[in-house]
Amino acid sequence: MESLMRLVLVLFPFFVVFFVPLDHVSSESISRANFPDGFVFGTASSAYQFEGAVKEGNKGESIWDTFTKEKPGKILDFSNADTTVDQYHRFHNDIDLMKDLRMDAYRFSISWSRIFPNGTGEVNPDGVKYYNSLIDALLAKGIKPYVTLYHWDLPQALEDRYEGWLSREVVDDFEHYAFTCFKAFGDRVKYWITFNEPHGVSIQGYDTGIQAPGRCSLLGHWFCKKGKSSVEPYIVAHNILLSHAAAYHTYQRNFKEKQRGQIGISLDAKWYEPMSDCDEDKDAARRAMDFGLGWFMDPLINGDYPASMKSLVEERLPKITPEMYKTIKGAFDYVGINHYTTLYARNDRTRIRKLILQDASSDSAVITSSFRGGVAIGERAGSSWLHIVPWGIRKLAVYVKDIYGNPPVFITENGMDEKNSPFIDMEKALKDDKRIGFHRDYLSNLSAAIRNDECDVRGYFVWSLLDNWEWNSGYTVRFGIYYVDYKNNLTRIPKASARWFQTILSGSSSTSDSSKLILLEEATEQQQEYKFQEK
């Protein structure tokens, strides 16, 4: 009986999340008042997607510079981010937009190859000067910087030298890079994020090969010249965990006492809903969570990989030694969650997918889908992978609370895209009611997770302030609450969603009707106001 009770206590959180339905919350209005005092609202970006100026300021090349030039066919419109939205030159204007929206914070990333053009060696003073200027400009407007150290753009020099994240050498180099940033900027930056979406880096860069550095072995290297999809993702993830822990402890030893900052990591996390009520699909949904969020959260919380991963991946999963356990477990002050959508999950009984692909993505023995019985889980956004499922963010928050002990969480990315096409005129693009509804309903569910379920969620970052270059999608989709006119000097024009955020962050409740927020004629007149003026 005693052992049975222990089993019940272990399984209880799992039972609560997957078996007890949460109310699906939808609200016609939402405001800052629906969140606790001190809750942070901000927007998010990354260096490669926003900065441009890839050949200015003595910046070195990154793996994404190389990837877009050597493999342009892997970008939907064959584009690159050489210019993108040119925030490198326009950040003062963009900060004014954030201030106008009443945002509290801005999450951006530092380009490693701007600080160290060769990955290591001499610090580039031009890079330090640029980020000092950006940080100072944010603080001058009362906006807190949340700084990501790595958002996918490894210096190409390190990829050439020792194959980047596949080598244990990268741990020391990342620690040195992090130390340099803490020393240069930590007197003003109090929230650091070591890595953005390490799961995405591992799978998309080293399993499917659709993102930099483009390594895979699918169908006998049909898609990639180099790589091993069943092994390399696990090595990369392991080295990223060690690098994160090294940066965390470097901060604790050298900077924490004086700077009083916090160190986190941003993990991409879908919610997985069982396809049916049968036990095998419920187990599959839990495995999907293990192979996604749990791949990194379990080591940080418990000091080891999830049991399901150790069982299914076996010897291909690197071992966390007792020494690593001491370093990795508890190596965070908060967790960032990047959440966009929810999928159905069912058990892969036949394992044919695994037999054919021989890759890490099929190790979990889970098949996911946005459809059940021919019905979509939610309305589709611009991209086929993104369906709008607001209740998923609440279930995810409760899962993190119940499974991982309710750590401090920031939603470091949430947003939706719409198609960018020459056949969509500006007037239609500015009237983005769907985006307003998306954020209203996701925020309503997040508020319920905080107020009703007692989840320790402390902030919400919109992806994104501006339309921008979106990795494999290039410029074919728009995530911004500001429209970027790519044909007219990269002019920033507020969409209805921008004015909606301005209203709710000013303390007022707001409807989702864009006609009550901003007239499209007014938005057109405001183009001149937001045009770039050289400083």
From Swiss-Prot:
One GO molecular function term of this record is: beta-glucosidase activity
Note one Pfam family from the annotation: Glyco_hydro_1
Quote the EC number: 3.2.1.21
Query: Which residues does a beta-D-glucoside bind?
Result: 49, 151, 196-197, 340, 413, 463, 470-471, 479
Q: Which SUPFAM superfamilies match?
A: (Trans)glycosidases
**Positions in coiled-coil regions:** none
The positions making up the signal sequence are 1-27
PANTHER family the record matches: GLYCOSYL HYDROLASE, LP05116P
UniProt similarity note: Belongs to the glycosyl hydrolase 1 family.
Provide the protein name.
Answer: Putative beta-glucosidase 41
Upper lineage is: Eukaryota, Viridiplantae, Streptophyta, Embryophyta, Tracheophyta
